[in-house]
């Protein structure tokens, strides 16, 4: 069983993906970390985030161990990742890696921004997780503050808005929901309520596939 979870920044998709993977005992891949690790490699080496050749080389040479880097989830890396993710050759370089993971015997859970549309268009379950811009900004600001990083709400909200715009307008694999995805709005849901709602979506899909 392949479960594809897509959604914008701070919608809660990563948390839901991890919980579902644990529940169904499936491997989980946060595909956003691939782009974050690519961006981090460029920043560390002094490369240019908008140089297509440099970014593509970083993606092709990605070391899976780098996905464990402590600062991958920083806001700076997140913004940089959104820039390299708009480069077609970077997406192509990382696509095969993601598809190989999705082909894990028994299934897998992947979350990102183009899982249900590009990486796993035939996924058994597709969930598009969303939330209001204000709710997502509040969550991200709280997350940053919890790590001791600057988390000014207005700044965070504008950064998320800009990232949404970049992702939606990139030339390759623009961010959008799959036509057959089930929407889950987490604006007014806590983690447990969101998980229960996601679990209900998956269970319902399993029943339909079995019938």
Curated annotation (Swiss-Prot):
One of its GO terms (cellular component) is cytoplasm. InterPro entries: Cytidylate_kin, Cytidylate_kinase_dom, P-loop_NTPase. It comes from the Bacteria. CDD domains: CMPK. Pfam families: Cytidylate_kin. Residues 153-172 are annotated as: Disordered. It is found in: Cytoplasm. One of its GO terms (biological process) is pyrimidine nucleotide metabolic process. Its EC number is 2.7.4.25. Residues 158-169 have a biased composition (Basic and acidic residues). It catalyses: CMP + ATP = CDP + ADP; dCMP + ATP = dCDP + ADP. ATP binds at residues 7-15. Keywords: ATP-binding, Cytoplasm, Kinase, Nucleotide-binding, Transferase. One of its GO terms (molecular function) is dCMP kinase activity. Belongs to the cytidylate kinase family. Type 1 subfamily. HAMAP family: Cytidyl_kinase_type1. This is Cytidylate kinase. It comes from Beijerinckia indica subsp. indica (strain ATCC 9039 / DSM 1715 / NCIMB 8712). The gene is cmk.
């Amino acid at each position: 069983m392949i479960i594809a979870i897509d959604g914008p920044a701070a919608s809660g998709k990563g948390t839901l993906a991890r919980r579902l993977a644990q529940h169904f005992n499936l491997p989980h891949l946060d595909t956003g970390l691939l782009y974050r690790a690519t961006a981090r490699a460029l920043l560390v080496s002094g490369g240019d985030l908008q140089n297509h050749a440099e970014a593509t080389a970083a993606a092709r040479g990605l070391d899976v161990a780098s996905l464990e880097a402590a600062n991958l989830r920083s806001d700076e890396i997140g913004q940089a990742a959104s820039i390299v993710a708009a480069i077609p050759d970077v997406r192509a370089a990382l696509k095969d890696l993601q598809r190989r993971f999705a082909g894990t015997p028994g299934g897998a859970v992947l979350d990102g921004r183009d899982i249900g549309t590009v990486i796993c268009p035939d996924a058994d379950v597709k969930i598009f997780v969303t939330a209001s811009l204000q709710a997502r900004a509040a969550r991200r600001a709280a997350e940053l503050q919890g790590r001791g990083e600057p988390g000014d709400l207005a700044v965070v909200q504008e950064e998320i808005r800009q990232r949404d715009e970049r992702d939606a307008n990139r030339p390759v694999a623009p961010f959008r929901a799959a036509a057959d995805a089930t929407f889950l709005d987490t604006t007014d849901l806590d983690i447990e309520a969101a998980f229960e709602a996601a679990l209900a979506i998956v269970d319902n899909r399993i029943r339909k596939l079995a019938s």
